[in-house]
Amino acid sequence: MIKLRLTKDAKVGCCFLIFGLLNNLLYVIILSAALDLVGANVSKGVVLLSNIVPSLACKLSASILHVHKFKFAKRIGFCVFMSILGMQWIAWSSSVPSKMLGVSLAAISSSFGEISFLHLSSRYHSVSLPCWSSGTGLAGLFGASSYLVMTTWFNFSVRSTLIISSFLPLFLLIMYFFVLPESESTSPSINNNYTPIESIDLRAGHVSFNFVNSLKQTFIFMQPYLLSHMFPQFLVYFSEYTINIGVAPTLLFPPEKAGFSSFRDFYPTYQTVYQIGVFLSRSSISFFTVPYLRTLAITQFIILLFTILQSALYLTSSYHFVLFLIFVEGLIGGTVYVNVYHSLQTTESSQRELAISTVGSSDSSGIFLASLVSLFLEPSLCHFQADRGRDWCALT
């Protein structure tokens, strides 16, 4: 009996590790490819904005539309289809607007998949969430480093890299249908105090009433989580994505100081180091939990302010110190993410999946605001540098 239990836990852990890896992998590759997708003259915030708008829409609507009541097989199949379609669209597009449409398609898959797999994790043994989190961290590490290796070391074209990557989500279907054991719980978690949309009447008055009622109930349900869960996650994601998209492309040094051949190599290197931090911290939940989420969120914001000053004023000529800050940024981001969702596992089972959907919108909201800020922050920093004799941004 013990042997069977361990075997099942191992299968569940392996599946959720792969789920986290493959669901987030294309998202990371797209962000790592941001500079190559839009060029040096367009803010990388355009890529993030194209990614996060559909993602935010998915997460905001998840609790309102009761996504947790749909069958997982259909949800996962939809995610795989949208991933392949989005990456192929990006790869074969020539104009920036067309590429951004592909980014949006892939973003729908990633965000819908995250909510779905977090829902699925709540139906399994406690090993599922740590393995999911480790997988998402591994996706960051593997996605950023593989893009760096394929395009910088092996000189693969951006198109070839994207085409090869686009078919990886097919393994999600294999793991779900052929490897993942049956869950202990088979029925969707529904908050007994939450009023669902019981039916959709085609008469306009009934549709409006039901939607508004569901929206109100969602806001009521959200209130206990605002300060404890949603605020730390919002601030952390706003800070780290503003750094990654709005500031990091401008954190440049003479290439020879870092052992690089060109200024272009800095950005994917920052992304890789950041993802190492994310992977380590998201994997830490198996060993310890961190309760000081608001303190970490404020620390992340302080790092954002320092990197902005570094970009503008060149406070230090130490490339390795800045690289260390990027690593710490990844550690904080991953720590807050995994501890927020881990704490939701103690929520009453009838409310757990709805709580996950509700809290899940906070990270996307932070990323959305970061993308708007980055649209003007990155070019502003580049112009500020150029006015003071550092025109390195133009050389990326």
Curated annotation (Swiss-Prot):
Consequence of changing residue 240 to K: Normal trafficking to vacuolar membrane but slower than wild-type; enlarged vacuoles
Protein name as catalogued: Protein btn1
Membrane association type: Multi-pass membrane protein
Any GO BP: regulation of intracellular pH
Protein family membership: Belongs to the battenin family.
Transmembrane segments: 15-35, 45-65, 76-96, 138-158, 161-181, 234-254, 296-316, 321-341
A GO MF term: transmembrane transporter activity
Chief location of this protein within or outside the cell: endoplasmic reticulum
Any single Pfam family the record assigns to this protein: CLN3
Cell compartment(s), UniProt: Endoplasmic reticulum membrane; Vacuole membrane
Entry keyword set: Amino-acid transport, Endoplasmic reticulum, Membrane, Transmembrane, Transmembrane helix, Transport, Vacuole
Role summary: Involved in vacuolar transport and vacuole pH homeostasis. Also required for cytokinesis.
Domain of life where this protein originates: Eukaryota
Organism: Schizosaccharomyces pombe (strain 972 / ATCC 24843)
GO cellular component terms, A-Z: cell division site; cell tip; cytoplasm; endoplasmic reticulum; endoplasmic reticulum membrane; fungal-type vacuole membrane; vacuole
